[in-house]
Amino acid sequence: MRILGLDLGSKTIGVAVSDPLGFTAQGLTTVRRTNKEKDIAEIKKFCDEYDAKVIVIGLPKNMNGTIGPSGEIAMAFGKVIEEELNVEVKFWDERLTTVAAHKAMLEADLSRNKRKKIVDKVASTYILQGYLDMISRK
């Protein structure tokens, strides 16, 4: 069983998957959002392909730790995923993951155009890896 990581944006969803042992996260793709039903169908494909029973969703929090409108949207979407796909949804504080993703891509000397295309996939990898690191310490 693997674990999926999602970075939910208003236009795209970054998708990452754990290795079979749950130690490392690898970025899979970025899905262009269309509507809720199609977004859920895309996520279901990944759940089926990787036999994922747990999905970690990045939870946007304000810098003071409170949950704002984006966080509420992520939590509502997570609830829909949980109900429709019969998977366990976990939330992971995603503060600064996109910043870290941009920094890593700049250090890798990726062009602005390339960074724009993969930033959500890279951010989903950071989200999932943070969660995997936390559960491995338990």
Swiss-Prot record:
Annotated EC: 3.1.-.-
Record-linked SUPFAM superfamilies: Ribonuclease H-like
Chief localization: cytoplasm
Cytoplasm found in the keyword field: yes
Location in the cell: Cytoplasm
MF terms (GO), sorted A to Z: nuclease activity
Any Pfam family matching the protein: RuvX
Alphabetical UniProt keywords: Cytoplasm, Hydrolase, Nuclease, Ribosome biogenesis
Family affiliation: Belongs to the YqgF nuclease family.
Physiological role: Could be a nuclease involved in processing of the 5'-end of pre-16S rRNA.
Designated name of the protein: Putative pre-16S rRNA nuclease
Annotated organism of origin: Clostridium beijerinckii (strain ATCC 51743 / NCIMB 8052)
